[in-house]
Design a protein with these regions (language model features):
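Short, basic amphipathic alpha-helical segments that act as recognition/interaction helices
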Residues: 42-67, 100-123
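Long, compositionally biased, charged low-complexity segments
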Residues: 3-10, 36, 113-117
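Short Lys/Arg-rich basic patches
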Residues: 2-25, 59-85
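Short intrinsically disordered terminal tails
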Residues: 1, 120-127
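Feature targets compositionally biased, intrinsically disordered low-complexity regions
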Residues: 40, 71-73, 93, 117
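Surface-exposed, Lys/Arg-rich phosphate-binding patches that contact polyanionic backbones
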Residues: 8-12, 23-48, 83-102, 106
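Generic hydrophobic/packing signal
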Residues: 19-21, 26, 34-37, 54-57, ...
Length: 127
């Protein structure tokens, strides 16, 4: 089984709760994305978008990513994620001596940047 196949199959495992804090400026950006997706007929909530962002980030395994600073307007959220995605975020947090929320916020910014460039398909992310 290839690593990609293993990753895809692991997404079928039961979801676990992942707590994180999302700053106000990032919530605003997520809301703009949610509105655009709604206009395209895709009804997504905050958890859906965060789950999609972290899953694609874990799958693509980019070698660099942007940061997302806290702004004093952060709100805690609990997102259901596949175990493999949580393990990826935890691994990066440990390796780079960051918090899991720091990595998760960076993943969301990375995802939204990809979406804005129209590069959200997995085969285009790797390029």
């Amino acid at each position: 089984m290839t690593p990609e196949q293993h990753f895809i199959l692991s997404l079928l495992s039961p979801m676990k709760t992942f707590p994180m804090v999302i700053p106000g400026h990032l919530r605003a950006r997520i809301d703009r994305y949610r509105i655009l997706r709604a206009q395209a007929g895709e009804d997504l909530n905050l958890s859906d978008i965060v789950r999609q962002a972290l899953t694609l980030f874990a799958y693509a395994r980019p070698v660099s990513w942007p940061t997302a600073e806290m702004d004093g307007q952060g709100k805690a959220v609990n997102v259901k994620l596949p175990s493999v995605v949580i393990e990826h975020v935890e691994g990066l947090a440990g390796f780079y001596n960051e918090t899991k929320s720091d990595i998760a916020r960076a993943a969301i910014v990375w995802f939204l940047d990809q979406e804005e460039r129209g590069q959200h398909e997995p085969n285009r992310i790797a390029q």
